[in-house]
Regions:
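A short acidic/histidine/glycine-rich donor-binding loop in glycosyltransferase catalytic cores
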Residues: 288, 306-319, 331-332
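Conserved donor-binding/catalytic loop of nucleotide-activated donor transferases
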Residues: 124, 264-266, 282-291, 310
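Conserved nucleotide-sugar phosphate-binding/catalytic loop shared by glycosyltransferases and other
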Residues: 10-21, 40-91, 167, 319
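A short, well-ordered alpha-helix in the C-terminal region of glycosyltransferases
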Residues: 339-353
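Donor-nucleotide binding loops and adjacent catalytic segments primarily
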Residues: 46, 51, 56-60, 183-189, ...
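Active-site-proximal region of nucleotide-activated glycan assembly enzymes
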Residues: 122-185, 190
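Glycosyltransferases and closely related glycan-assembly transferases
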Residues: 93-106, 114-129, 142-147
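C-terminal alpha-helical cap of glycosyltransferases
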Residues: 3-4, 332, 352-371
Length: 371
């Protein structure tokens, strides 16, 4: 609601979230869904200079406003004493953005930017919608769900938040409508892959993952010998040299902007199990070996659990993923067409893939109710 209490002819919506693709991807997917419903809606994204949002939000065609980041230490450290001052500065900056936008609603996706945005919106009496991406909620969204709003939406059923309603995780329309088989030939040509060879896609998420990079690349010769080609996204700041030991390519990229093509090219993926990755991979029916990030609240293991429980994926602890494990297990799985087909069938439909439209409609309903 704007301060005057009247719904403007063109709603103004501020979306707060940043840091990693886990926050920016659902934000962009939601913005796209809002624009499909009403192309005139004013959409402003709120982020910090530290995150992926400084690149991907403008590339997606949305206005981005930056506020100072306020990392919240998980354990008592001297940095904790600086938090109140930083928070006041960041809340003030967020309030300025909300005021200038005449925001009708704030939608928060978590991350450093969300806590000050929630406080600023609450003080301004602007309606707040929280979307929690992980099975285990983060600090910012816990705070907002408890103190700031009753509009709390989650990516997974059973997430422990007050007022939680399961809607799923918004993902890009290019992913949710992907026909992997129809796009496979184009996708493999795009990445310079053989059109027919069994294909492994490897990704550690938007920042890459050293353990995954080292374990899979260390088994490159064995994968080649088994007749397997590899598409490996190593992360924007990482380097990796893999000797070409056979006729099939081992393609190394820092970042994949066309994830739809990467999923279409692949028969199997080795990946982390962030909420966005699990939703996209299972949504397109791609069999997966999930390697949960071994830090945080243990949310990545829980994110993958619904898919793994029905047989759509395999879960392996980060510490257990080694070169020897890859040699012993990946070729065996990737060359078993019957099992891959069963995994693909099992994964499809486990997790909702229409959350972008669902969340967009909820946001607009909140705006209408507040008017």
């Amino acid at each position: 609601m704007n301060p005057a209490g009247a719904l403007k002819a063109v709603p103004s919506i501020v979306l707060a979230g940043g840091g990693s693709a886990g926050h920016t991807s659902p934000l962009i997917a939601t913005a796209d869904a809002l624009r499909r419903i009403d192309p005139t809606i004013e959409i402003i994204a709120l982020g910090t200079e530290r995150g992926l949002e400084t690149r991907v939000i403008p590339e997606a065609g949305y206005r981005l406003e930056l506020i100072p980041p306020v990392p919240l230490p998980r354990k008592p450290t001297p940095a904790l004493f600086a938090v109140p001052g930083k928070m006041l500065s960041s809340v003030s900056a967020a309030r300025k953005v909300l005021d200038e936008a005449k925001a009708d609603v704030l939608v928060g996706f978590g991350g450093y930017v969300s806590t000050p945005a929630y406080v600023a919106a609450w003080r301004r009496k602007t309606p707040i919608v929280v979307h929690e991406g992980n099975a285990v909620p983060g600090i910012a969204n816990k705070f907002a769900a408890r103190y700031c709003t009753q509009h709390v939406k989650t990516s997974f059923p059973g997430t422990d938040l007050p007022h939680a309603e399961y809607v799923g995780l918004p993902i890009r329309r290019a992913i949710s409508t992907l026909d992997r088989a129809a796009l496979r030939a184009e996708a493999r040509q795009f990445f310079g892959l053989d059109p027919d060879a069994p294909t492994l896609f490897v990704t550690g998420g938007s920042q890459g993952a050293q353990r995954i990079n080292e374990s899979v690349s260390g088994a490159a010769a064995d994968l080649q010998a088994a007749g397997i080609q590899v598409l490996h996204a190593i992360g924007p700041k990482n380097t990796l040299e893999v000797p070409q030991t056979g006729p099939l390519p081992y393609v190394v990229l820092n970042y994949v902007d066309r994830m739809d093509l990467a999923y279409a090219a692949a028969d199997l993926v080795v990946c982390r199990s962030g909420a966005n990755t699990v939703t996209e991979v299972s949504g397109v029916g791609l069999p997966a070996i999930y390697v949960p990030l071994p830090i945080g609240n243990g949310e990545q293991r829980l994110n993958a659990k619904p898919v793994v429980d029905v047989g759509g994926g395999v879960l392996i602890d980060n510490a257990e993923l080694t070169v020897d494990w890859v040699r012993a297990n990946v070729p065996q799985l990737l060359l078993d067409r019957e099992r891959l087909t069963a995994m693909s069938t099992a994964a499809t439909g486990v997790i909702r893939t229409d959350a972008d439209d669902r969340l967009a409609r909820i946001i607009l309903d909140v705006v209408r109710s507040a008017s």
